[in-house]
């Protein structure tokens, strides 16, 4: 399987996001990236939008519902939201949407900070493997993977996608 070029996806996502926000009458959203890949995608997206807005970052480790199964990520960092959440239009950015559990955790954390006016979900990739009813408003590409395959994003400069075969990693 050949993977798409993240730089090309980001350019298209910037166009699609502008159209989505314009259609909804949103002119000054707050941007939030989910660590770590979502922060990289958010940085690239803000650059493509030529938008100097501050970027908030979320570390959702303590909000995940699979915490007891997977344990704590070894490098938990605090979330950093340099703006109010209450009443704001938010653009929540993640790198890869798979089960939907990371986005659910991010939404739970955001609501602990306040009640946003709206949340627009932007993902570089949607793996169409959702376990929860969560879909991105703006997506770079939708891919279908075999059960033993995963996509890894490396970055931040340049962003690159790698297909990993878990069956050969054992």
From Swiss-Prot:
Family recorded in the similarity comment: Belongs to the purine/pyrimidine phosphoribosyltransferase family. PyrR subfamily.
Top-level lineage group: Bacteria
Reactions it catalyzes: UMP + diphosphate = 5-phospho-alpha-D-ribose 1-diphosphate + uracil
Keyword Amino-acid biosynthesis found: no
Motif PRPP-binding boundaries: 90-102
Gene name per UniProt: pyrR
Species annotation: Pseudomonas savastanoi pv. phaseolicola (strain 1448A / Race 6)
EC number: 2.4.2.9
Keywords: Glycosyltransferase, Transcription, Transcription regulation, Transferase
Signal peptide: none
SUPFAM superfamilies (UniProt xref): PRTase-like
UniProt name for this protein: Bifunctional protein PyrR
Xref: InterPro entries: PRibTrfase_dom, PRTase-like, PyrR, PyrR_bifunctional
GO biological process: one example: regulation of DNA-templated transcription
GO molecular function annotation: uracil phosphoribosyltransferase activity
């Amino acid at each position: 399987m050949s993977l798409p070029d993240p730089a090309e996806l980001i350019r298209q996502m910037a166009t699609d996001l502008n159209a989505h926000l314009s259609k909804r009458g949103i002119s000054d959203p707050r941007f939030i990236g989910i660590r770590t890949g979502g922060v990289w995608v958010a940085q690239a997206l803000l650059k493509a939008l030529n938008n100097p807005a501050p970027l908030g970052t979320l570390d959702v480790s303590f909000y995940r519902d699979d915490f007891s199964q997977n344990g704590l990520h070894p490098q938990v960092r605090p979330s950093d939201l340099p703006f109010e959440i209450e009443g704001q239009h938010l653009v929540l950015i993640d790198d890869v949407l798979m089960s939907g559990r990371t986005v659910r955790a991010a939404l739970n954390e955001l609501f602990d900070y306040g009640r946003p006016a709206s949340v627009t979900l932007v993902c570089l990739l949607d793996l169409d493997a959702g376990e929860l009813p969560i879909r991105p408003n703006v997506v770079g590409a939708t891919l279908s993977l075999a059960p033993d395959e995963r996509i890894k994003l490396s970055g931040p400069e340049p962003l690159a996608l790698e297909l990993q075969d878990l069956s050969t990693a054992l």
